[in-house]
């Protein structure tokens, strides 16, 4: 009998959610995703310190923003030597409300990849699913730069991403689960909110059905998992990005993985497709306390780690 990881691969593209490219080798993901927090965690390991030092040594006089982007691309290049597919590299979260700056940084990241001989088709530029981030992705996509919209917690965000024609979205599962569990307090019963009843799983399922029912080609990559059950409950999703720890857990477990999401699923009603204008987007997002709070929190956390990464690079450069 095959492992659950192998069984999952039959239905879903498996992606590694880490900056630790050495951890990817044994688990053979197709793609990989990174973010500022994952890169910060990786460069604090002794094994990756030479990569940081080389970037600083080769570009010592460069501004911190450029050093950061060069470090991200250095990690991305190493990852692409391991995975056969794509890597997602994130624009600085501090630019989440600045469309123009996000576009400029996204173009800059792609230019660095292409200068290193990496075709743009192997790179996804990650931006936050704010209104500004989504509009930046619209412009980048028009330039032939494929985008991954992250920090996505609600159907209105997904609708706006589809309207912008983005390549891929990353709806979060675990952070939605965290919010509802905290809100429920002592009333939360884990067994009753597992599997298809998990609020994070339900959110991704809602988005998946909306996209497939309306023939939307934007890829859906479930992200931010807290346990193996959440992953198995989304088998059949286009892609799932999974931490090395949970990948290893799936690899060590034997058994079949039934398909939970299918393109021809007719279960349940879905809203009519609509264009996403700014007033509608902000109104709908504001009405969803969970999505509003988790989006803001995610930007704060990624921004804080970007500041720490700046400090680490600045220290290495003697500034």
UniProtKB/Swiss-Prot annotation:
GO terms for molecular function: transaldolase activity. It is found in: Cytoplasm. It catalyses: D-sedoheptulose 7-phosphate + D-glyceraldehyde 3-phosphate = D-erythrose 4-phosphate + beta-D-fructose 6-phosphate. Pathway: Carbohydrate degradation; pentose phosphate pathway; D-glyceraldehyde 3-phosphate and beta-D-fructose 6-phosphate from D-ribose 5-phosphate and D-xylulose 5-phosphate (non-oxidative stage): step 2/3. One of its GO terms (cellular component) is cytoplasm. The active site is at residue 126. Its EC number is 2.2.1.2. SUPFAM superfamilies: Aldolase. The keyword Zinc does not apply. GO terms for biological process: carbohydrate metabolic process; pentose-phosphate shunt. Keywords: Cytoplasm, Pentose shunt, Schiff base, Transferase. Homodimer. HAMAP family: Transaldolase_1 (MF_00492). Transaldolase is important for the balance of metabolites in the pentose-phosphate pathway. NCBIfam families: talAB. Belongs to the transaldolase family. Type 1 subfamily. This is Transaldolase. The gene is tal.
